[in-house]
Each structure stands twice: as structure tokens, then as C-alpha cells.
């Protein structure tokens, strides 16, 4: 989890924000998934947020559900996902790698075993999307035992108690929700969340990255101007994959261009 701290220190010294793309591992196939990750890094991604496909994704909108179905159709299994993660870590030793997933996948092998496996392949953080802070003890304790950062979602309506808990338990970064609901680029990010960001800073929370509905450079710029340490974009990236399934070269080029544009918005003016 030290990779996040090193990244944020490096970016702060340059007065930059972080741009973090999300993709589902195995979409559209394990082999193409690794090429897609290369394109994201070449485009300038500061860190990666990766999903392990799951049959019942509660927080995902239609775009990411389609990605999950494509990954399943290509035969992607959790074991293969861990092989991909090990390959990505080997290729990019300093890049923070986060997982975004659901509790059933953590439970399937035992919570401690899951985090041990994450640590073994070089995963820096895990966000379990369907586990609220008040039920997170077994997850965050296992994560900390294995030096994996437990990531918590800060919703737009978080009260003071929740903000204090997130600040106390979270490591790596804080996933700041632009709005309630499911993911999707078609649901644009709401206005910057200055109040929450100020409170998280006051309580010494891990740096906030704003996610949900980030699909254009202006939104990245607005998030950083509001005090976020950066932005996460998922559905807009997965949409590019979906729209170019029949043309691999165009897909990789479009992904690179998109990341380059959103990363550029994180640079000082």
C-alpha cells in the first residue's frame, strides 16, 4: 500500500492530480485485457483500478455489467485474474494496483486467504463494494495483516460519524462518490464535493479520488480544484472497449487517447 503514498507524494510535488482508469479483468478476453492495461499505462494512468468479474454486481451500471458478461464469456476465472494481476505487477513494479470487487469473491476462499493472495501478487488495495464500513472489520483486519490497503466509499450524503470512520479505517485512498446510484458515464458526475473533501482532510483520511460518472477532462479538473487528489473513470473507458470490439488496434489507440486527455486535465494549468 506504500505505492499510493509514494504516488501522491510524487504528484503533490508536481502539483498534479491522479488519473486512475478502471477496467474489468478478462474483458473482452484475458489476453486482450493485458493489452488494454498496457494502453492505459502508456496513455498516462497514475494507478489502476481493476475488477474481478462477478455474477451479481450490485453497484455496476449496464456498461460494466456488459464487461463482466464479456469476461465470463471468454472463460475468465478468479484464478486467471490473479495470474493477470501478477503479470501486471511484474511489468509495472511501481504502479499502484487496486481491486474493486464484491464480498462473495472474498468469502469464496476465506477472507484471510484472499488478502494473502492479493499481497502475493502485488495488489495494493481492495475495495469491497457491497460491505459497508460498519460491517468491514473482518475485511479491513485481514487487509491490514497482509499490508493491503482497505478502501472505503465515501457517499455524497455521508454524515460526520461515517466520515470519521472512513478516515480512521481507510488506507491508500478514499473513493469519493460523485453521486448515489450505480456507475455509468451517462449519469454525469455532480458538482464537486468541497464539504466532504474538507472534512476528510480535517480527519486525516487517505487522499480522496472522485469516481462515478467521470467521462471528460473538465470533470477531472473540477474534482482536483475542489480538493480531491484525483479522479477515477470506469464506465467511459469500458464503453470504448465495447464500441471497438471488432477493431483491436482502434480500441487500444482510443483508450490511449482518452487516458491522455483526462490525465492532461490533472496537470497544473
From Swiss-Prot:
First-level EC class: lyase
Q: What is its EC number?
A: 4.2.1.20
Record's keyword annotation contains Lyase: yes
Catalysed reaction(s) here are:
(1S,2R)-1-C-(indol-3-yl)glycerol 3-phosphate + L-serine = D-glyceraldehyde 3-phosphate + L-tryptophan + H2O
**Can you name a GO cellular component term?**
cytosol
Give all cystine bridges in this chain. none
Entry annotation: catalytic residues: 49 (proton acceptor), 60 (proton acceptor)
Gene Ontology molecular functions: tryptophan synthase activity
Q: According to its UniProt record, in which pathway does this protein act?
A: Amino-acid biosynthesis; L-tryptophan biosynthesis; L-tryptophan from chorismate: step 5/5
InterPro entries given in the database record: Aldolase_TIM, RibuloseP-bd_barrel, Trp_synthase_alpha_AS, Trp_synthase_suA
Keywords, comma-separated and alphabetical: Amino-acid biosynthesis, Aromatic amino acid biosynthesis, Lyase, Tryptophan biosynthesis
Protein function: The alpha subunit is responsible for the aldol cleavage of indoleglycerol phosphate to indole and glyceraldehyde 3-phosphate.
Q: Which family does it belong to?
A: Belongs to the TrpA family.
Q: How does it assemble?
A: Tetramer of two alpha and two beta chains.
Question: What name has this protein been given in UniProt?
Answer: Tryptophan synthase alpha chain
Q: What organism does the UniProt record list as the source?
A: Cronobacter sakazakii (strain ATCC BAA-894) (Enterobacter sakazakii)
Q: Top-down, what is the taxonomic lineage of the species of origin?
A: Bacteria, Pseudomonadati, Pseudomonadota, Gammaproteobacteria, Enterobacterales
Q: Report the gene name.
A: trpA
